[in-house]
Amino acid sequence: MAAQGRIVWVSGPAVRADGMSEAKMYETVTVGDSKLVGEVIRLTGDVAFIQVYESTSGLKPGEPVIGTGNPLSVLLGPGIIGQLYDGIQRPLRALSEASGSFIGRGITTTPVDMAKKYHFVPSVSNGDEVAAGNVIGVVQETDLIEHSIMVPPDHKGGKISNLVSEGDYDLETVLATTEGEGETVELKMYHRWPVRKPRPYKNRYDPTVPLLTGQRVIDTFFPIAKGGTGSIPGAFGTGKTVTLHQIAKWADSQVVVYIGCGERGNEMTEVLVEFPHLKDPRSGKPLMDRTVLVANTSNMPVAAREASIYTGVTIAEYYRDMGKDVVLVADSTSRWAEALREMSGRLEEMPAEEGYPSYLASRLAEFYERAGRVRAAGSPDRDGSVTLIGAVSPSGGDFTEPVTTHTMRFIKTFWALDAKLAYSRHYPSINWMNSYSGYLADIAKWWGENINEDWLSLRSEVYGVLQREDTLKEIVRLLGPEALPDEEKLILEVARMVKIGLLQQNSFDDVDTYCSPEKQYKLMKLLVDFYKKGQQAIKEGTPLADIRAMKSITTLLKARMDVKDDEMPKLDQLDADMQEEFKSITGVKVSN
């Protein structure tokens, strides 16, 4: 029997109702005469505390609260890709058609078009035994996504019967029935799954394959693996959103889930405007054909921010179970934590550090632990991954505040954005001294097998130059660069070249916005070759001024924008020209 109670107290998005003894934790309820969507978050006797996912203006004590008997769930099936949802998977385009620019309260519609037909190709036969997670057929969802129709994870299994033949069917069509353990279950193209419950899998693997983003400072210096976790904290104006947009655009994953959680609406609009016109570099198809957007902007109800994170990660796990690599980008987890803080305050809970609830760390852990590279449940065997990347917006760029410090406990890649770099127009403004990646050793083998076996040693050499430059900064600040010998002045010069020619990247330049792994390796090798040849030339008595005057330096610094990904021979020619120029200024051939 569904719980039925009455509102006794309203405080912003928090509502208290009595007569709810039949309710369960995290059960979805309808609140008030307007039937607003809410979720039970605490039970004390027959009193339920409910967070409401819509505006509670006008709610008053005495209005009914009715339980649905189900937890907050999302609909999973064909038609999700390319959609724009709010935090509880309501399609915003459909809602805008129904109610105009401002969404009315209590309006609901199906998350996908249930009447749209897809061409279903069965992969099982009548009489076959199936279990939870088995693929029974496929449909083509978009030009980029072949969508596997799977037996729901909570299915008990059984024999297939009444299987439809290949053809066009809508989502409500019963594709097959299963018979087992005395019950008959209908299988359709879609099923529902609770957002707070991770989807099951067979095995979990170590993340050993890099997620290539086309951003040099990430891929080369602080890489993230498929199935890994990363965080990008930074103060206001340091470029978090643009960096996350770049990852969402160019990451070599099959599906991208972009969650705008409590940020400006214009940032979601930018994604909606740009992505349909941008082409996937691997397939040439529009990027929206692989993207799902969950928009929960700063002026939307605060309670739905928490739900938006869980909605997004559940959709990501669904596509992971098809054997796809999924990237989930959350911008920003700080706004999500602020929503937790507001709800905690409304519920009069004891605050912890900076007013955040004491369970902030466990909620962050729940989210980041849903990342991973796994073998999906059922058959045939499918390997997929969910990579979680969360932005953090610490007030004033203070990385010691609770959200940043707790996040650092649960992630392995940390891209620290630096306001000084951003204000000096160095983008992406990832500080190479404060950032780190725990996946470097795991993915070095992939780079060695697929790009070049000396990738790790070159990366160490370039990073060593940046570290040595950092130690020399203090001397230069006190005594000036002229106090240094030529060998150390060369380090400063090469570090400058690394920053401009390798670390900096222009997201608005057609060539430089995406950099292939081969080009990243060649640019890094050019800089290391220049450094080694410069060292040898100085040992042989060549003045540093002659090295600084080389024309090859300008060409090398502009190569990131002048040389396209399919023009690698140009970089080989640049290396040869640099070799000749060193020969001319030293008078002897400098060995590699």
UniProtKB/Swiss-Prot annotation:
The keyword ATP-binding applies. It is found in: Cell membrane. It is a peripheral membrane protein. Has multiple subunits with at least A(3), B(3), C, D, E, F, H, I and proteolipid K(x). Component of the A-type ATP synthase that produces ATP from ADP in the presence of a proton gradient across the membrane. The A chain is the catalytic subunit. Belongs to the ATPase alpha/beta chains family. PANTHER family: H(+)-TRANSPORTING TWO-SECTOR ATPASE, V-TYPE PROTON ATPASE CATALYTIC SUBUNIT A. This is A-type ATP synthase subunit A. The gene is atpA.
